[in-house]
Amino acid sequence: MPHTLAQKILQAHTDEEVREAGQIVNCHLSGVLANDITGPLAIKSFRAMGAAKVFDKDRVFLVMDHFTPQKDIDSANQVMVTRKFAQEMGVTHYYEGGDCGVEHALLPEQGLVKPGDLVIGADSHTCTYGGPGSRDVAAGMALGRLWFKVPPTIRVEFEGKMPKWLRGKDLILRLIGDIGVDGALYKALEFGGETLSELDVEARLCISNM
């Protein structure tokens, strides 16, 4: 049986043979993302692990996009913890204030991720980067690898011409309405069909991140 796209990506990042959905594989990471909410939690776990340095200062991405600017002392402290960690570890890609943007869009816009990469990011709405927890991100920052459960895949074909004024967000909201918010739990959605050829990268990123 041919591998799905998700399986091919996992296979490219592991020394094990990816055979079937449900299998646990240990993969090397292309990058690790955290923000000003999940970052301090990950940093706390990172230090609790006894880690002395990040696995690659060029492949850890810290984006302060929730509290920009900081609204109070607590949010300022969140950013300060992450900023000091970035300075201590020599993290190359730290974004705050005028250099910042929405984390989900910032990485591809800056050319920090590309097709075929395996990136994890801790955020409740980081489908693009897997959406793991802060402890997983801590392990990723320290080790540069993480375990993954090979997901079953749902193939979605979008056919027909896009009506005027509709965008990628409209497509994915309709799909969610059809399958339900829990319709693809622990599954990978792979998209195809002639409609996608009309969509720009921004619209495709929107579909992937919902």
Q: What are the functions of these language-model segments?
A:
Residues 1-210:
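Fe-S-dependent hydro-lyases/dehydratases of central metabolism
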